[in-house]
Amino acid sequence: MTFPLPPGARRLWFLEAFADGAPLHNNPAVFRLTGTVSVDALQRAADLVVARHPVLRTTFDEVDGEPVGRVGPVGAADVVVRTVPSASASASASASASADAADAAAEAFAAQAAREPFDLRTGPLFRIRLGRITPTDHVLVINTHHAVVDGTSLLVLCGEISALYADPARPLPDPGAPPDGVDDDPSRRVSDLDGAPDLLTLPTDRPRPRMRAFRGELRRHAVPDGLTARVDALARATRATRFVVLQAAYAATLGTTAGQDDIVVATLWSGRPGPEFAGVVGMFVNPVPLRVGIGGDPTFRELVARVRRSVAAGLGSAAVPFDRIVEAVGASRDPSHAPLCQAHLVMQDPPEVVFPGVRVDRMLPDTGTADVDLSLMVESGGAEMAVVTEHDMDLFDDATVDGFVGRLLSLVERACADPDGRLSALTAGTSVVAASVAGPAAAPAPSTVLEMIRFGADGLAAGELSYAELERRSAALASVLRAKGAGPEAWVAVDLPRGTDLVVAILGIWRAGAVYVPVEPLWPEPRRRAVTEAARVVLTEIPDLPEEFERVDPGITPDSLAYVFHTSGSTGRPKAVGVPHRAVAEMLARSTALVGLGAGDVVAAMVSPAFDISVWELVGPLTVGARVAAIPPEIVVDGPALARRLMAEAVTVVQVTPSVWAVLVAAGGVPDCVRVRVSIGEVLTPELAGSLGGAELWNTYGPTETTIWSTAERVHPGSRFGIGGPLDGVAAYLLNAGLRPVDDDVVGEVYLGGFPLARGYLGAPGEPRRRLLPVRRPFPGG
């Protein structure tokens, strides 16, 4: 006899093809039994439940390309008893050592039995494994495939096995017929889920694989005493249920951790529309996506109201098969993640068995798999809720999941105490200011950049220009510029390619007391015009410089502007970011010390002068007596030519974007002469970082508004890395939308303070107030 599969079983039939032999859909219940267990009684009870429920005798096949179920004849249940060796079974072993060894043996047997794969075509899809550690110590694993038994059915089976073990003649209620039919109209859910994000972007410990391997782990988490009662009290106060309160807290923790306001979490509907179906065994459960918006910084009470409406909408169409919803919504079918919902919240009583004269303790039924990124399972069988997580091990470490649950439980505690508290306050972390990046201490920086330039150094400063020639030419240019009206705070627009003349121009402008304002030759004409019209002088070439000239006093202070860079910003219009000498001097002193830049180094200048990071490579070397080697733009984009040029110039330090590093790697690798490799301006991927090994590699970060480098991290081969810690003297905060600190592993917005702050957006008086916050010691230790 064959029959068409119900939607849930049909979905698992197709998903099994992607599991690649992993026990992804095993559905075990695991127990530690202390006392004498009757194997005969267990076999008899199992035989009786197999006879009672045809689904336990079902296998799967395809007919005309469609999956079908086939019910087999009544027969003996698959019950196997195995002896479990214990490592400390000797008489000389201490009691504690023997107990530890028995526990380890029990865990190993439970894992092996829970993960034993099923074959949907050949069956059986229901089995019992009993591991005998000692005559009075056993592990019982009741295992089924999810395609035939869902979580509610597993509770039924465990209850029936318990009853029939104690009394095989005990009459049990007729299981009844399975629920009939499903709701095949997803239209209401489409309106609920229209525009929902495809992916929950929780920060991961490793990059998401292109194809899921379904490797997972279960973890049990302690719940504070009395929390269940407090949650129930909050549910009553907000006219909600325990599930709604926990769903609100779960969605809020997911959203604040991921930095997303729009969250979709799936819960599981039992597929049993009434109590008359309580004893039916089968696969009827259906994932129900619930969408929750946490934006606008609601109070927790307001969030509970949102979730209550979301749950009502979802459960009102709970009978619509999940696959139909995914199809109707047009959710992505990306093999790297589950469609539509990558987080689940499940509330369900745990399965139990009761055998006369036997103590029964539940064990975690860990199959070593996970079908979504993170599942939260709340068991409510005791006085306190039990919280268990299942996470994708390819994405998250145990500590990350433990931290997530800690934040979730903290939010629940805070919400119970203050349901009218704003989400930004209730989810605020305890992290304050990031620790500075470790490295050599920098000498106290002079108050202006000019005081740092090593004009008296021997050797070449830039290209073939010596330090002595650089000093004379920049001083002569300063005299010429001052005569043209370029003094303190006056802008000098510079339209020069990177090279020796550009270095002379920058220092000449500063020695005149003026402000360096670079112009990018490739800018659109309107933008170039806007910048040059604001300048007192426009420098398109180095003029003929006098042999004799009167040296000028720059007349600058640490707070005088050193340069102005133009960023397009969100409006597309150029914003003038003015940075004072103090910030540039401090940054160069700390960053050059951090990477050990010295007089023997040659630094490649490869970045467009329109970007502030060019200052580091054009001026930074001059503060330590090193040499600048300018690389023409056409060579920078030609990997083989770039490698040859770096070797010809004997370059030892390179600071470029990952895009340029990739050009070098593709051309055969970075020349060995480059001992320090700095990535800046773009995201450095682990793959590219691995290709840049064999030398000192730094990943750095810093917006124009905070002077080139704000944070840095030394990248070691094979290690996990980020943007690093702040440079000494930089205050770095990670804050939420309410300007409160966030914890580790939580997405927030970086706020930077300390010495490197720009003066502001020049000519835009409103911008500094919005983006440069005048906060004085906002947090303890800040």
Segments the model singles out, each with a brief description of its role:
Residues 575-602, 612-652:
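Conserved AMP-binding/adenylation subdomain of ANL enzymes
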Residues 496-500, 514-530, 626-649, 655-660, ...:
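ATP-dependent adenylate-forming carboxylate-activation enzymes
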Residues 496-499, 520, 561, 597, ...:
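Conserved AMP-binding
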Residues 623-626, 651-655, 665-722, 731, ...:
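Gly/Ser/Thr-rich phosphate-binding loop
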Residues 1-173, 204, 228-229, 257, ...:
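Carrier-protein-dependent adenylate-forming modules in NRPS/ANL systems
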Residues 150-156, 352-357, 758-769:
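Cytochrome P450 core scaffold surrounding the K-helix E-X-X-R motif
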Residues 321, 346, 538-554, 584, ...:
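AMP-dependent adenylate-forming
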Residues 10-19, 28-36, 46-48, 62, ...:
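Adenylate-forming
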